[in-house]
Each structure stands twice: as structure tokens, then as C-alpha cells.
Amino acid sequence: MRIAGVNLPLNKHAVIALTHVYGIGRTSAENILQRAGIAPERKISELNDEEAHAIREIIAEDYKVEGQARGEQQTAIKRLMDIGCYRGLRHRRSLPVRGQRTQTNARTRKGKRKTVAGKKKATKK
């Protein structure tokens, strides 16, 4: 079954499968299924075309998903960088934005270590 350009896994429960769509988390998935009148524990393979269509309609109406959600997130980050605020500077420098320490850790954000040569030890004569 395909929703918002994403192939949902047929063997998973509907509530879990919907979270494979970018922009839909567990709570949103539960709300969508409740509005469509579908039990969350039903598998995607068990849904008929009518139920699938109801899910698609609800998502199209009320949710920003996939490309639209990613685009909005990128626009928000770009705006922060353009206005030159602290958060924007942290994004620009690829450093943690939310106040985490950086002297140690922050490897995910900073990337692989760039080794800096230390002082050579003088040998005794």
C-alpha cells in the first residue's frame, strides 16, 4: 500500500506502518486511524481500498508530510542562518544547537575527528 509516496510495510500494524511516512509519528498515526475508524492493531495487508482511501484523504487534508515537511524544516533552518541568531550560527558551523557540551562528545554533529599534531617530546641527551 502506498501513502504519500511511501510504500508501507504490509506485515506491520497500521499504527506502526504509518510512522514510516516522514512527518507522521506515533500519536499522529493513532489520531489518523481513529478518525478513519480503523483499529490500530489491524495490519496494512488487511485494509481494503475504502479504508486506504480514507487514510490518504485525512493525511492530504490535515498533515504536512514527506517533501513538504522536509522543505519547511529546511526553510526554518535557513531563516535562522539568514537572520544571524545564535541558533543559526550553530547550524552554520555544524555544532550542537541546543546547548550541549562540545569540548568532549558532539561527534555526530561535528563529524569525524580532525587530528591536530601535538608538540614533539624533547629527547634527553
Swiss-Prot record:
<dbReference type="GO" id="GO:0006412">
    <property type="term" value="P:translation"/>
</dbReference>
<dbReference type="GO" id="GO:0000049">
    <property type="term" value="F:tRNA binding"/>
</dbReference>
<keyword id="KW-0689">Ribosomal protein</keyword>
<dbReference type="InterPro" id="IPR010979">
    <property type="entry name" value="Ribosomal_uS13-like_H2TH"/>
</dbReference>
<keyword id="KW-0687">Ribonucleoprotein</keyword>
<dbReference type="InterPro" id="IPR018269">
    <property type="entry name" value="Ribosomal_uS13_CS"/>
</dbReference>
<dbReference type="Pfam" id="PF00416">
    <property type="entry name" value="Ribosomal_S13"/>
</dbReference>
<dbReference type="GO" id="GO:0015935">
    <property type="term" value="C:small ribosomal subunit"/>
</dbReference>
<comment type="similarity">
    <text>Belongs to the universal ribosomal protein uS13 family.</text>
</comment>
<feature type="compositionally biased region" description="Basic residues">
    <location>
        <begin position="107"/>
        <end position="125"/>
    </location>
</feature>
<comment type="subunit">
    <text>Part of the 30S ribosomal subunit. Forms a loose heterodimer with protein S19. Forms two bridges to the 50S subunit in the 70S ribosome.</text>
</comment>
<dbReference type="GO" id="GO:0019843">
    <property type="term" value="F:rRNA binding"/>
</dbReference>
<dbReference type="InterPro" id="IPR027437">
    <property type="entry name" value="Rbsml_uS13_C"/>
</dbReference>
<dbReference type="GO" id="GO:0003735">
    <property type="term" value="F:structural constituent of ribosome"/>
</dbReference>
<dbReference type="GO" id="GO:0005829">
    <property type="term" value="C:cytosol"/>
</dbReference>
<protein>
    <recommendedName>
        <fullName>Small ribosomal subunit protein uS13</fullName>
    </recommendedName>
</protein>
<dbReference type="InterPro" id="IPR019980">
    <property type="entry name" value="Ribosomal_uS13_bac-type"/>
</dbReference>
<comment type="function">
    <text>Located at the top of the head of the 30S subunit, it contacts several helices of the 16S rRNA. In the 70S ribosome it contacts the 23S rRNA (bridge B1a) and protein L5 of the 50S subunit (bridge B1b), connecting the 2 subunits; these bridges are implicated in subunit movement. Contacts the tRNAs in the A and P-sites.</text>
</comment>
<dbReference type="InterPro" id="IPR001892">
    <property type="entry name" value="Ribosomal_uS13"/>
</dbReference>
<keyword id="KW-0699">rRNA-binding</keyword>
<keyword id="KW-0694">RNA-binding</keyword>
<keyword id="KW-0820">tRNA-binding</keyword>
<feature type="region of interest" description="Disordered">
    <location>
        <begin position="92"/>
        <end position="125"/>
    </location>
</feature>
